[in-house]
């Protein structure tokens, strides 16, 4: 049935499939409320006015909102299957998302991307999958797969994709490197997402010549305003580690608010349960002083228009009937969720079922940890006088660079006194035996080791510890369980969580995953760790495109100067 066939319904000559009565329609176009009937047929909005329906629902004064949109996220950060993630966020109002699968792609390449696409397309939401642009994230990083322009061309020929995922290698862009520009040229008619932390001036100008449209790495009002003045959309990010909403709010005003939208980027299961998803960002924006209808507009209409999602993000004739029934605006209590006019969630519970076990389970995804034999000596810090140290910044994925010298003689065990831990990355895709070693200040671990197969973005094994023995056995346990997070102390495994899907994702329900992560977090806090999100923070210490100093399996990398640097300075 086409919209032409719906004309008699729009004109009031025939009954609509569904009519909401006595509701308050949130008009995001004008940031106001319309109190009229809302008619729906064939999955689209017919209009508002006086209508009769085959089914009529009395909303008793409840609000009707467009479905929420997450403009940029990595599903893998939720650490649960896609269907489990959907069952969590759809009842919270998220009906559209733009997902960049570069985590699973770094592990399993095309196989991983297609695995996500197959499952995501069988869920009642608008699933927009990007083609990752940076697999690996840089030319030197050691990932499990490489997606060059040729492979991307194969992917977009075989499947439907929304755009090119965040272009993180800005150095490759501004220096005109063919390996990244070939991908950009191939995807020039698609949405191209950005990753531009602190880029400004002529460097930003050069970066934007690639047709990059948006950025979610902006952290200050001045940075946001410059990027907007140069044509970018700003995805205000509120994840588990990086929380930029409060700092960016002063930049949003009546003249420029249409250039801002919401994104979660990376959110852990505990935070999805305790806080929520895009609904949490709306509530937080309102509490920080933003008008409720404007906050909803950022999460709906602004996102749809910025991303080029036609007939989404608003309540208007011909738009998709992706709707939320909201009890009140103060707490944003979501009573019901409708996708294409069909109820898919009610009272916080999903009304649909999808089982990924019904789909193929590729061995490259479910057996992805392959390490060479390791020794305690691999984690020994070489003797020296002055050391280069990663300086961790609380609640941020950016780091600083520091230097440390022992006041007298070298003694590895004394690093802990100065709030310094050892950190290493162990290559886990091709058993090369590569191990990069460094030091980090600010994590606070006083005893033992923490290892994880989640290490953005190449997802080798990252391990942080106070001693070589615990670091070794923690890494070996990761290999034994084929991915996960492991805590070791006093030469024993204390606890762990298994992440068998690419070493990134659990097969357990989100509640169980959240409980286990809370248990693990309590253990590491008892071992002295200070950071609020220890496992996600650790995972980002290996991302060599976010300043300043990061660790890879090839050693310490200075992101701003684009060079590997030594651990021992003299």
UniProtKB/Swiss-Prot annotation:
Q: Which domain of life is it from?
A: Bacteria
Q: What is its EC number?
A: 3.5.4.2
Matching PANTHER family: ADENINE DEAMINASE, N-ACETYLGLUCOSAMINE-6-PHOSPHATE DEACETYLASE
Report which reactions are catalysed by this protein.
adenine + H2O + H(+) = hypoxanthine + NH4(+)
Give the lineage.
Bacteria, Thermotogati, Thermotogota, Thermotogae, Petrotogales
Its GO biological process annotations read:
adenine catabolic process
Q: Which organism is it from?
A: Petrotoga mobilis (strain DSM 10674 / SJ95)
Which top class of enzyme applies to this chain?
hydrolase
Instruction: Extract the Pfam families matched here.
Output: Adenine_deam_C (PF13382), Amidohydro_1 (PF01979)
This protein's cofactor list reads:
Mn(2+)
Which gene specifies this protein's sequence? ade
InterPro entries for this protein: Adenine_deam, Adenine_deam_C, Amidohydro-rel, Metal-dep_hydrolase_composite, Metal_Hydrolase
Note whether Transport occurs among the keywords: no
GO MF annotation, one? adenine deaminase activity
Query: What family, per the record?
Result: Belongs to the metallo-dependent hydrolases superfamily. Adenine deaminase family.
UniProt xrefs under NCBIfam families: ade
Q: What is this protein called?
A: Adenine deaminase
Keywords attached to this entry: Hydrolase, Manganese
């Amino acid at each position: 049935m086409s919209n032409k066939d719906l004309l008699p319904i729009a004109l009031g000559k025939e009954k609509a499939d569904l009519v909401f009565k006595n509701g308050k329609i949130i008009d995001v176009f004008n940031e106001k409320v319309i109190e009229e009937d809302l008619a729906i047929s064939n999955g689209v909005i017919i209009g508002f006015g006086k209508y009769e329906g085959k089914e009529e629902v009395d909303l008793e004064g409840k609000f009707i909102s467009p479905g929420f949109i997450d403009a940029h996220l990595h599903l893998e950060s939720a650490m649960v299957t896609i269907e489990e993630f959907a069952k969590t966020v759809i009842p919270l109002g998220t009906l559209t998302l733009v997902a960049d699968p570069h985590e699973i792609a770094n592990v399993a390449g095309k196989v991983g991307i297609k695995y996500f696409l197959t499952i995501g397309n069988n869920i009642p939401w608008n699933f927009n999958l990007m083609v990752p642009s940076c697999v690996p994230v840089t030319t030197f990083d050691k990932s499990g797969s490489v997606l060059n322009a040729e492979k991307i061309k194969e992917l977009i020929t075989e499947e439907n994709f929304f755009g090119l995922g965040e272009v993180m290698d800005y150095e490759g862009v501004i220096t005109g490197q063919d390996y990244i520009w070939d991908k950009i040229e191939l995807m020039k008619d698609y949405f191209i997402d950005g990753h531009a932390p602190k880029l400004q001036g002529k460097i930003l100008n050069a970066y934007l010549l690639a047709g990059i449209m948006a950025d979610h790495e902006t952290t200050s009002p001045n940075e946001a305003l410059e990027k907007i003045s140069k044509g970018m959309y700003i995805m205000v990010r509120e994840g588990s580690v990086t929380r930029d909403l409060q700092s960016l709010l002063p930049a949003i005003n009546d003249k420029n608010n249409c250039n801002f939208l919401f994104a979660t980027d990376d959110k852990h299961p505990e935070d999805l349960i305790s806080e929520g998803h895009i609904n949490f960002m709306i509530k937080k924006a309102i509490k920080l002083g933003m008008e409720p209808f404007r906050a909803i507009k950022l999460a709906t209409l602004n996102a749809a228009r910025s991303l080029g999602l036609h007939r989404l993000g608003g309540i208007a004739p011909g738009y998709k009937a992706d709707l939320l029934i909201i009890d009140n605006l103060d707490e944003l209590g979501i009573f019901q969720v409708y996708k294409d006019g069909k109820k898919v969630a009610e009272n916080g519970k999903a009304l649909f079922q999808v089982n990924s076990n019904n789909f193929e389970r590729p061995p490259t995804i479910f057996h992805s940890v392959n390490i060479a034999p390791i020794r305690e000596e691999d984690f020994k810090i070489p003797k020296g006088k002055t050391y280069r140290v990663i300086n961790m910044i609380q609640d941020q994925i950016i780091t600083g660079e520091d230097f440390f010298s022992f006041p007298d003689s070298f003694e590895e065990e004394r690093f802990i006194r100065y709030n310094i831990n050892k950190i290493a990355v162990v290559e886990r895709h091709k058993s090369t035996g590569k191990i990069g070693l460094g030091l980090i200040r600010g994590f606070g671990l006083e005893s033992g080791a923490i290892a994880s197969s989640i290490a953005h973005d190449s997802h080798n094994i990252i391990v942080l510890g106070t001693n070589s023995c615990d670091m070794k056995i923690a890494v070996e346990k990761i290999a034994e369980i084929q991915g996960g997070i492991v805590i070791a102390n006093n030469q024993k495994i204390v606890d762990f969580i298994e992440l068998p899907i690419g070493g990134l994702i659990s097969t357990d329900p989100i509640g169980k995953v959240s409980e286990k992560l809370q248990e693990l977090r309590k253990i590491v806090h008892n071992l002295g760790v200070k950071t609020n999100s220890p496992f996600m923070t650790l995972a980002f210490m290996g991302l060599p495109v976010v300043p300043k100093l990061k660790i890879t399996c090839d050693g310490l990398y200075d992101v701003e100067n684009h060079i590997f640097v030594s651990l021992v300075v003299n």
